[in-house]
Amino acid sequence: MTKLSKRQLDILRFIKEEVKTKGYPPSVREIGEAVGLASSSTVHGHLARLETKGLIRRDPTKPRAIEVLDEEEVQIPKSQVVNVPVIGKVTAGIPITAVENIDEYFPLPDRMVPPGEHVFMLEIMGESMIDAGIFDKDYVIVKQQNTANNGEIVVAMTEDDEATVKRFYKEDNYVRLQPENPTMEPIILQNVSILGKVIGVFRTVH
């Protein structure tokens, strides 16, 4: 197997597609435009590495003479996976990711998880956040933290020890947890415990 960088893989795919659709390979300038490289010397460098790896053959005397060789299998770089805890219940007085709170673990690509941060997932029940694109039975991806800025969507523990997902606003003498549904009223609290900030949504199609 030949391991390629994303840029090299993009170049190789573009060359193959151009040969397939047009019958001849692209120029160096066209390759650069397709993959976002302004410098022709940078494109030449990538082509040289592809040639060294045995994936293409070039004729230096001709501007478009690039032949793709298919003898080797190209290995597409794979994302690392992070197993994120899915919280089944939120219990007051114990950490959100305590073992007794966790239903299962869900694998997410590492690019969806901020480096060095603690992240958990929570299933949404109800329609209080539909105008924010968060629907019943969705799973929110939450970065664990105990503070938030006004307007951020948070997981908060109310005075009744119930977890809720709402938009956070700190007013003069109280906290307003604002739903994103015009048919629902905000929750007004004197004290609230923030468990985390919502950074993503995962949805399955039924």
Curated annotation (Swiss-Prot):
Keywords: Autocatalytic cleavage, DNA damage, DNA repair, DNA replication, DNA-binding, Hydrolase, Repressor, SOS response, Transcription, Transcription regulation
Superkingdom of origin: Bacteria
A single GO BP: DNA replication
SUPFAM superfamilies the UniProt entry points to: LexA/Signal peptidase, Winged helix' DNA-binding domain
DNA-binding region: 28-48
MF (Gene Ontology): DNA binding; serine-type endopeptidase activity
Catalytic reaction equation(s): Hydrolysis of Ala-|-Gly bond in repressor LexA
Annotated EC: 3.4.21.88
TM segment ranges: none
Active site residues of this protein: S128 (for autocatalytic cleavage activity), K166 (for autocatalytic cleavage activity)
Any coiled-coil regions, as ranges: none
UniProt site (Cleavage): A92, G93
A Pfam cross-reference name: Peptidase_S24
InterPro entries for the chain: ArsR-like_HTH, LexA, LexA-like, LexA/Signal_pep-like_sf, LexA_DNA-bd_dom, LexA_repressor, Peptidase_S24_LexA, Peptidase_S24_S26A/B/C
Family from the record: Belongs to the peptidase S24 family.
Entries under PANTHER family matching the protein: LEXA REPRESSOR, LEXA REPRESSOR-RELATED
Role, per record: Represses a number of genes involved in the response to DNA damage (SOS response), including recA and lexA. In the presence of single-stranded DNA, RecA interacts with LexA causing an autocatalytic cleavage which disrupts the DNA-binding part of LexA, leading to derepression of the SOS regulon and eventually DNA repair.
Name of the protein described by the UniProt record: LexA repressor
Organism of provenance: Bacillus velezensis (strain DSM 23117 / BGSC 10A6 / LMG 26770 / FZB42)
Gene transcribed to yield this protein: lexA
